[in-house]
Amino acid sequence: MQSVPFNPAVALRFIEYYNTTLQFQSTLAFLKDPPAEYQQPPVDVMQVLKDIQSNVTAGVYQNQYSFEADIQLLLSRMHDAHIVLYSGVLEPFTFASPLGIISASVDGKLAPEVFLVGILNKRLITTSRS
């Protein structure tokens, strides 16, 4: 993946386009300055995009992978499943598990725990038969 050459001119055009697209994201101000109870750290999306643009101009990226990885990192920091970018180098590779996970409280009062769906289903069936 790191052997794919990087084209700075194309990257700059993409950033300009994506900047325009992200202007429609309604949570930018919230992400930049979230309330105290928000569980994720703040991220200034537009500033990070400008930083990536500066990296392109400064010649920081030596391959397409490192550029796309920075874009994807920005998007993941937004913690929004509605923000998805299918990019060229990273798109063919996905890492997934055939096992589903779920977060649930065992009694509705305790803090949620992470379970494999199959194990939780077995636990629920066993509990309901008791």
Model-found features: residue ranges?
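Terminal targeting/pro-maturation regions of precursor/exported proteins
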Residues: 1-130
